C-alpha cells in the first residue's frame, strides 16, 4: 500500500510539476547507490525517502512561487526589469528544506532510512545548498556586472555628450577668435589710414588755429584803422572837435593780445553796433538840421547872420545830438543788448534763427557760431563786403565834398532874364540837385564806419542871403547836361547794378544813354527795357510804372526818332535836336506865376494854379496864410522873388529886413520849358522847412521817393 501511494504521489507530482524528472533521477541514482552500499536497505525506505524529498521540494517551490507572485503584485515594474536575472523554478525547487528534529525522530522511529542513508542524504542536501549559494552569488555578480555596465554606458554617453558640447563650445570659441582676429587684421590694415587722417586733421587744426590768430590780429588792426578813419572823417566835417592827443585814445584802449575768440567776437560786434547807431543818427539827422534848430535859423535870418555862422551853429547842435545818441547806444550795449540780436531773431548773416530771450541767443551764438571754419569764412566775406563798401564810400564822400564845394561858390557871371521863371522848373531843378547828392549814396548800415551824410553848408531856410546860392545851383544844374552821362555811371556801374537806388537822371537821359551805348546806335523798345533792368537794380521792380514812362518819353520828345528796318521798329537819337532842346531858353508862362507884391497875405494871393502845384508838391505851408507871420514876411518875399527868377545876385553882406526888399535883377536862366507832369510830387528840402515853427510838420521832414520824372528836366 505504501508503494502504491508513493507511486501515485510521484505520478501526481510529475504531472503537476515540470522539471522534477531531473531531481527524481538524481534521487533514484542516490537511492541506488545507497541500496548498493547498504545491505539492510529495503525498497520501502527508499520510496519513503523520495516521497519526503519530493514533498520538501514541492513546498519550497510553492513558497518561491508565492513569494514571486506577491513581489510581482507589489512591484511589477521592478519584476519586469529583473526577469532575466530571476532564478529558474527548477533551481528554486531545489532549495534545501531543513529537517526538523521531530521529522528526524519520526524517520528514525519508523526506520525508513538507515543512519548511513540519512548521512548521505544530509551530505547531498549540503551539496545542493552549496550549489544554490554559488548560483545565487553568480547571479548576483552578473547583476552587479550588468548594473556596472549600464552605469558605465550611461557615464560614457554623458561623457560623450559633454565632450561633444565642449567640442562645440571650442569650435564656437575658435570661430569667435578667428572673427576677432580678422577684425583686428582689418583694423590693423585700416589703422595706418586712420592715423594718417588723424595726423592730417591735427595739422589742419593747427593751421586753422594759426590762421585764426592771424585773422584776429587783422580784425583788431582793421578795427583800429576804421576807428581812426571814422574819427578823422568826423573831425574833418566838423561834427566833433577832438584834440590831437585824444584821437588815439579809443585805439589805444583796444587790447592787442590775450583775447579769447568769444571776447574778440563780442568786441567786434559792440564796435560795429556803436558805428551803426552813429550811422543811423547821421542819416536821420543829416537832412533835418533846420528842423532840429528852427528857432536858431529863424533868429539868424532876422539878425542878419551870415550863412557860415548859421552852418556852424547847426553843426554844433547836431554834434550834441550825435553825442547824446552815442551815449544812449553805449548804455544800450552795457544793458545786455547785442548787435546780432534784434526782435527775437539772430542777425548773423544767413542765420535768422528765432531766439526767445537774450540768454537763449547767447547759447545759440556760442553753439552755432563758434570760432570754426564756417564762421571764419562768413566773417571773411563780411570783411570783403565792408572793404568794398568803404572804398565806394570814400569815393562818394570825396565826390560829395567836391560837389558841395563847387555848388556853394558865389556866381561870377549873372545873366539877365527878361521874363519870370517857371515855378515848376525851379522846383524841379532844386529837387534834382538834392537827388544827385544824398540819394545816390550807397546805404550801408552794416559797415563799421559811418557813411558821411551830405550836410548843406548853407542854411536850409531860404533867406535873401542864400538866394545867390540857389541861383548858382540852378545854373550849375543846367550846365550839368554838358557832362556826358557815361562819366557819371561808369565809376558807379557796379553800385547801380546791385543796389536798389534810384539813378539821378531823367528818363530821356537814360534812354539816350542806352541808345548811344549800342553798337549801331539804335535799339528796339524791348532792348531799351533790357538795358534799364540790366544796368540799374532800381528798375527790376515796378515794371509797369517806368515802362509806361519810357514809352511816353519816346513819343513825347522829338530827339527820339522811330525808324522802320529789318528788325522792325527801332529808336535812334537826333543829337542836334537833343542838344538844341537842352540849350533852348524857357519863355515862361504868365498864367502860371503872377507878379504878386510882398505883403502879409502872400499865401492867400497865390492863384489857383500855384496853390494846386504847391498842394501836389506837399507844401501846405505856403498855401496856408495862417502860418505866415510878420517875422517871416521878408523870408517869403525872398522865396517869391527866387521862384519868379527875378533874383540871382544880392549884396554879399546879405542885407535883408522884413520891411525892405532888394532891387530885383533880371537874369537869363537856362531851364528847359516842359509841360507840368506828375514829377513835382517831390520838392526841395529847403521849401519844406521854411518857417518851420510848428512841431506838427516834423513828420513831413522825410518825403517818400517817387518814380523818375517823365520829362527831360
From Swiss-Prot:
Localization in the cell: Nucleus
UniProt keyword Kinase present: no
A Pfam match: FOXP-CC
Annotated spans, CTBP1-binding: 420-424
Polar residues bias spans: 1-28, 313-322
Highest taxon above the source species: Eukaryota
TM regions (residue ranges): none
Parts forming coiled coils: none
Biased composition (Low complexity): 290-303, 436-457
Protein keywords: DNA-binding, Metal-binding, Nucleus, Repressor, Transcription, Transcription regulation, Zinc, Zinc-finger
GO biological process, one term: putamen development
Record remark on domains: The leucine-zipper is required for dimerization and transcriptional repression.
Self-association state and partner proteins as the record states: Forms homodimers and heterodimers with FOXP1 and FOXP4. Dimerization is required for DNA-binding. Interacts with CTBP1. Interacts with FOXP1. Interacts with TBR1. Interacts with ZMYM2.
Name listed for the protein in its UniProt record: Forkhead box protein P2
Native organism: Hylobates lar (Lar gibbon)
Amino acid at each position: 500500500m505504501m508503494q502504491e501511494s508513493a507511486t501515485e504521489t510521484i505520478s501526481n507530482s510529475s504531472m503537476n510539476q515540470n522539471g522534477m524528472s531531473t531531481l527524481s533521477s538524481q534521487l533514484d541514482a542516490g537511492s541506488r547507490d545507497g541500496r548498493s552500499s547498504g545491505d539492510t536497505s529495503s525498497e520501502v525506505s527508499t520510496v519513503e525517502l523520495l516521497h519526503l524529498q519530493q514533498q520538501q521540494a514541492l513546498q519550497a517551490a510553492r513558497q518561491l512561487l508565492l513569494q514571486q507572485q506577491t513581489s510581482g503584485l507589489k512591484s511589477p515594474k521592478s519584476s519586469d526589469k529583473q526577469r532575466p536575472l530571476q532564478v529558474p523554478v527548477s533551481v528554486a525547487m531545489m532549495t534545501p528544506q531543513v529537517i526538523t528534529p521531530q521529522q528526524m525522530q519520526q524517520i528514525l522511529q519508523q526506520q525508513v532510512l538507515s543512519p548511513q542513508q540519512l548521512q548521505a542524504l544530509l551530505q547531498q542536501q549540503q551539496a545542493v545548498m552549496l550549489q544554490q549559494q554559488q548560483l545565487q552569488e553568480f547571479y548576483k555578480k552578473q547583476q552587479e556586472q550588468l548594473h556596472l555596465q549600464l552605469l558605465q554606458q550611461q557615464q560614457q554617453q554623458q561623457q560623450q555628450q559633454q565632450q561633444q558640447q565642449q567640442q562645440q563650445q571650442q569650435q564656437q570659441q575658435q570661430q569667435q577668435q578667428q572673427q576677432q582676429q580678422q577684425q583686428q587684421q582689418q583694423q590693423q590694415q585700416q589703422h595706418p589710414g586712420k592715423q594718417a587722417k588723424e595726423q592730417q586733421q591735427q595739422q589742419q587744426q593747427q593751421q586753422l588755429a594759426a590762421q585764426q590768430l592771424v585773422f584776429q590780429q587783422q580784425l583788431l588792426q582793421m578795427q583800429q584803422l576804421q576807428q581812426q578813419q571814422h574819427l578823422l572823417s568826423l573831425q574833418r566835417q566838423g561834427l566833433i572837435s577832438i584834440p590831437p592827443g585824444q584821437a588815439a585814445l579809443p585805439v589805444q584802449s583796444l587790447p592787442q593780445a590775450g583775447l579769447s575768440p568769444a571776447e574778440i567776437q563780442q568786441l567786434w560786434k559792440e564796435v560795429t553796433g556803436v558805428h551803426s547807431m552813429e550811422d543811423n543818427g547821421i542819416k536821420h539827422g543829416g537832412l533835418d538840421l533846420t528842423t532840429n534848430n528852427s528857432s536858431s535859423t529863424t533868429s539868424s535870418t532876422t539878425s542878419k547872420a551870415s550863412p557860415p555862422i548859421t552852418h556852424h551853429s547847426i553843426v554844433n547842435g547836431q554834434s550834441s545830438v550825435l553825442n547824446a545818441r552815442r551815449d544812449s547806444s553805449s548804455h544800450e550795449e552795457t544793458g545786455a543788448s547785442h548787435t546780432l540780436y534784434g526782435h527775437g531773431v539772430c542777425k548773423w548773416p544767413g542765420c535768422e534763427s528765432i531766439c526767445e530771450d537774450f540768454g537763449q541767443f547767447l547759447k545759440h551764438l556760442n553753439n552755432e557760431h563758434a570760432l570754426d571754419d564756417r564762421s571764419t569764412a562768413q566773417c571773411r566775406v563780411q570783411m570783403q563786403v565792408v572793404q568794398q563798401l568803404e572804398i565806394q564810400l570814400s569815393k562818394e564822400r570825396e565826390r560829395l565834398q567836391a560837389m558841395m564845394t563847387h555848388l556853394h561858390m558865389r556866381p561870377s557871371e549873372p545873366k539877365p532874364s527878361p521874363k519870370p521863371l517857371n515855378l515848376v522848373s525851379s522846383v524841379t531843378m532844386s529837387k534834382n540837385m538834392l537827388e544827385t547828392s544824398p540819394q545816390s549814396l550807397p546805404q550801408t548800415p552794416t559797415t563799421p564806419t559811418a557813411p558821411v551824410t551830405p550836410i548843406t553848408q548853407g542854411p536850409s531856410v531860404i533867406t535873401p542871403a542864400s538866394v545867390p546860392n540857389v541861383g548858382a545851383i540852378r545854373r550849375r544844374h543846367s550846365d550839368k547836361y554838358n557832362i556826358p552821362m557815361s562819366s557819371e555811371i561808369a565809376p558807379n556801374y557796379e553800385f547801380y547794378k546791385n543796389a536798389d537806388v534810384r539813378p539821378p537822371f531823367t528818363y530821356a537821359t537814360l534812354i539816350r544813354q542806352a541808345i548811344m551805348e549800342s553798337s549801331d546806335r539804335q535799339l528796339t523798345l524791348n532792348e531799351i527795357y533790357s538795358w534799364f533792368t540790366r544796368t540799374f537794380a532800381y528798375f527790376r521792380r515796378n515794371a509797369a510804372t517806368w515802362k509806361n514812362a519810357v514809352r511816353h518819353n519816346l513819343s513825347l520828345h522829338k530827339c527820339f526818332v522811330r525808324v522802320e528796318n529789318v528788325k522792325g521798329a527801332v529808336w535812334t537819337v537826333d543829337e542836334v535836336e537833343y542838344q538844341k532842346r537842352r540849350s533852348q531858353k524857357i519863355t515862361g508862362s504868365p498864367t502860371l506865376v503872377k507878379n504878386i507884391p510882398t505883403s502879409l497875405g502872400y499865401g492867400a494871393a497865390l492863384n489857383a494854379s500855384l496853390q494846386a502845384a504847391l498842394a501836389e508838391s506837399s507844401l501846405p505851408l505856403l498855401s496856408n496864410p495862417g502860418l505866415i507871420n510878420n517875422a517871416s514876411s521878408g523870408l517869403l518875399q525872398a522865396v517869391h522873388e527866387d521862384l519868379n527868377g527875378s533874383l540871382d545876385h544880392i549884396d554879399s553882406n546879405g542885407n535883408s529886413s522884413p520891411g525892405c526888399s532888394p532891387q530885383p535883377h533880371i537874369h537869363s536862366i537856362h531851364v528847359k520849358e516842359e509841360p507840368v507832369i506828375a514829377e513835382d510830387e517831390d520838392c526841395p528840402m529847403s521849401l519844406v522847412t521854411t518857417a518851420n515853427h510848428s512841431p506838427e510838420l516834423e513828420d513831413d521832414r522825410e518825403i517818400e521817393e517817387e518814380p523818375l520824372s517823365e520829362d527831360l528836366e
